[in-house]
Each structure stands twice: as structure tokens, then as C-alpha cells.
């Protein structure tokens, strides 16, 4: 039987930015956030297989996780059994995780120079980065993922990749 155990839609999402200038330097940052919503961690379904798949390495448990060993144990994972036939890794609410995050989407640091002796009013040199850091408790690669293949659950399934981290160098000239 099935039961509703959360929603993939966040309760609140958005972004904010800041720009600072000091002498000839400028710094700007853009953040994005999401609060609420559950993510189905498909990678855990595949790799936290509790011995079901004999052809794959088994995932090391994270701090605070434990395996069932004897009756009465309260554990986050079933017992690991080589060639496990118990289907311990079928779709389960244990693969649902909080989708909250705060992401540093972009950060740019620039320096402005006046080069009027060469006919240049301003030259700005800058370094920029995108998708630099994500603060989250989600154990997967990236909590900001599309729903896979029109699925009703938001999951980092096969064929989905996290946002690419980029680093750039730039030069702006004003004549």
C-alpha cells in the first residue's frame, strides 16, 4: 500500500543578492534558497543496496546511521546480507530527504582601472564563479534538480546531472 509522506514542492523558495564597492573594487553575490519539500535520493536506492546487488560496492553508512542487527534494534537501515533477497532497497520513504538548501549561485570580484592615457575611460578586470557552494543536509549531489522524466516525485535519477560549477575571468573596456 502507498501513503503520502511529503511533497516535492517547496513551501518557500527565492533568492537575494548583494553588491558592495570599496575604492576600485566591486563584489557582487547572488544566492538562491528553498525551504520545505522532500527529495527522493535515487542514488541511495541504487548504492545503499544492503547487499541486494552482488555486483556493486556497498555504501558506507554516514554518521548517525546504523544497521539492524537483532530484534529490538532501532536502526536506519536493514541488515546487510550478501545476495539479499528481501528487496530491502525497494522504493521506500527511507530514501526521502529534506530538500532545504541555500546556494551561492554566483560571486564576482572586479577591479576598475582608469586608463585615459590610452583612450580607455575604464578597464574592469574580474573573476567570477557560478554554483560555487550549497549548504544543505541532502546527502545527494545537488538538491536543486528537475523532476525526472515527468515523474511525480523529485529524484536525482539516472541521466540527471547536478548544476555545473564554472569559473570565469573577464575584461570590460569602456572607450
Tell me the role of every PLM-derived stretch:
Residues 24-27, 116-117:
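Repeated loop/turn-to-beta-strand initiation elements of outer-membrane beta-barrel proteins
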Residues 29, 125-127, 171:
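Membrane-embedded beta-strand positions of outer-membrane beta-barrel proteins
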Residues 21, 32-34, 128-132, 174:
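Outer-membrane beta-barrel pore domains and translocons
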Residues 52, 61-64, 70-72, 89, ...:
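C-terminal beta-signal and terminal closure region of outer-membrane beta-barrel proteins
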Residues 2-4, 92-96, 154-159:
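Extracellular loop and loop/strand-boundary signature of outer-membrane beta-barrel proteins
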Residues 10-14, 100-105, 121, 163-167:
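Residues that define the transmembrane beta-barrel architecture of outer-membrane proteins
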Residues 35-124, 129:
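Extracytoplasmic gating/loop element in the C-terminal half of outer-membrane beta-barrel translocons
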Amino acid at each position: 500500500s502507498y501513503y503520502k509522506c511529503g511533497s516535492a514542492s517547496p513551501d518557500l523558495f527565492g533568492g537575494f543578492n548583494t553588491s558592495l564597492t570599496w575604492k576600485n573594487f566591486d563584489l557582487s553575490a547572488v544566492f538562491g534558497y528553498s525551504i520545505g519539500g522532500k527529495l527522493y535520493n535515487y542514488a541511495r536506492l541504487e548504492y545503499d543496496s544492503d547487499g541486494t546487488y552482488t555486483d556493486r560496492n556497498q555504501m558506507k553508512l554516514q554518521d548517525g546511521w546504523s544497521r539492524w542487527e537483532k530484534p529490538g534494534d532501532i536502526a536506519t537501515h536493514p541488515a546487510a546480507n550478501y545476495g539479499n533477497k528481501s528487496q530491502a532497497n525497494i522504493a521506500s520513504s527511507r530514501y526521502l530527504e529534506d530538500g532545504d538548501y541555500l546556494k551561492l549561485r554566483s560571486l564576482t570580484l572586479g577591479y576598475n582601472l582608469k586608463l585615459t592615457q590610452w583612450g580607455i575611460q575604464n578597464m574592469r578586470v574580474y573573476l567570477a564563479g557560478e554554483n560555487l557552494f550549497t549548504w544543505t543536509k541532502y546527502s545527494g549531489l545537488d538538491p536543486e534538480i528537475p523532476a525526472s522524466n515527468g515523474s511525480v516525485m523529485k529524484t536525482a535519477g539516472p541521466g540527471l546531472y547536478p548544476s555545473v560549477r564554472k569559473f570565469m575571468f573577464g575584461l570590460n573596456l569602456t572607450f
